[in-house]
Amino acid sequence: MRALVIVDPGPASPPPETLPALLEAMAAWRDRWRSQMEMFEFFAGRGGGWGVFNVDDIGLSQAMMEFPFSPFSTIAVHPTVDGDDALSRFTQTTKEMLAQMGGG
């Protein structure tokens, strides 16, 4: 499964004295999940970032549970499908629905 994961800063920031340890943990987390991430990006000029995972549901859940900044973040997970395949399927489904409604 491919999924876009968007991480934004949450309502509570980590205590400043915890940042060095959190950043070390973040680097280790990235190394652990690197092979299953197609993209790994930070937002320019603000907190947060995004990544594209290619992993099964259990693996994605595990990665998010292990994410060091999760207590201080809002995380959105969006499963994705191939765009060309989705467009083709949506076009076909729309044609079928319109035909059933007498409009196609």
Describe each region flagged by the PLM:
Residues 1-104:
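Conserved, structured core segments of small domains
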